[in-house]
Amino acid sequence: MLDLSRAWGGVLTRATPLPDVWAGLAAKEIKFRRGQVCMVAAAPNAGKSMFALVYAIKADVPTLFFSADTDTTTVMMRAAAHVSGHSQISVENNLANDSHYYDSRFEKLGHIKWVFDSSPSIDDLELEIRAYVELYGQAPELIVIDNLMNVTAETDNEWAGLRAIMMELHDMARKTEACVLVLHHVSEQSEYGSPINPPHRRAIHGKVSQLPALILTLGYDPSQGTLKVAAVKNRFGPHTADASNYAQLLVNYAACQIGDEDQFGRMLRRDTMAGYQGGYNV
């Protein structure tokens, strides 16, 4: 055991924030921090996987991305669309004609290493992290788990399994001093209001909200090209459990672009509303 000052002296990251990539989130004091478990929860098709992908690309920190819920082809097309500004349809056509079409663009993704096991166990996650440390001499600063439901539990009880996994991820964040960003589902949206608005904290599936330091819920309005991001739990900043206080980002998911409420973001929103799918200088 240690006294508090000595324990504090041995902590390297001290909940160090990862880079802000959207001013709208920074204005709400929403920050992903090292040594902490953070959660992004949303209904299906709200864009949580794309949100995590774009954040990981733009944050530009050493990242280990467990893409269990999203397959290699989908990630490839989304990543290529984001770094090129092309629509995902254009990416698919370009790759069909030349599988190396986007190789030069993927230099922007060199900080991310991928694992595409569709149902990893906690032991599998730990083995991959150890392999990363052995290869690069340090742990990643960001570990993304997409998503919690895909991680294999050691019990047949779903809720007990989810809670046990979250406890392991909490321990993982402490030991690696990485930000562990876990994606998760919410319960049926009809119980908690409109699907275009972020769900309440109580909507999180499995009631696993105790351990994360930060929980964001997402509400996506495809007709308006808006993504609302609410901090329903935030140990280091303001939050509202009912998701009534949120940041708004502007998006064009067809081109895997997420922006602030600035000139570029407003263009994304206009294009989404007009059905235009891509062709951006990024």
Regions found by a protein language model. Give the residues of each.
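C-terminal regions of RecA-like/P-loop NTPase motor modules
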Residues: M1-S5, G9-A15, A23, P44, ...
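Structural recognition of the conserved hydrophobic beta-strand(s) that form the central parallel beta-sheet
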Residues: V144-I145, A178-H185
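Hydrophobic/aromatic beta-strand patches that form the interior of the parallel beta-sheet core
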Residues: C38-V40, L64-F66, V115, L181, ...
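The Walker A/P-loop phosphate-binding site
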Residues: M1-H86, A274-V282
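A short alpha/beta connector and helix-capping loop motif
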Residues: D156-H170, C179-V180, T226
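Conserved inter-motif catalytic segment of the P-loop NTP-binding fold
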Residues: T63-D156, Y276-V282
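Short, well-ordered alpha-helix to beta-strand connector turns
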Residues: G35, A59-D60, L109-G110, P212-A213
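Cofactor-binding loop segments of dinucleotide-utilizing enzymes, especially the Rossmann-like FAD-
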Residues: A68, H185, Y220
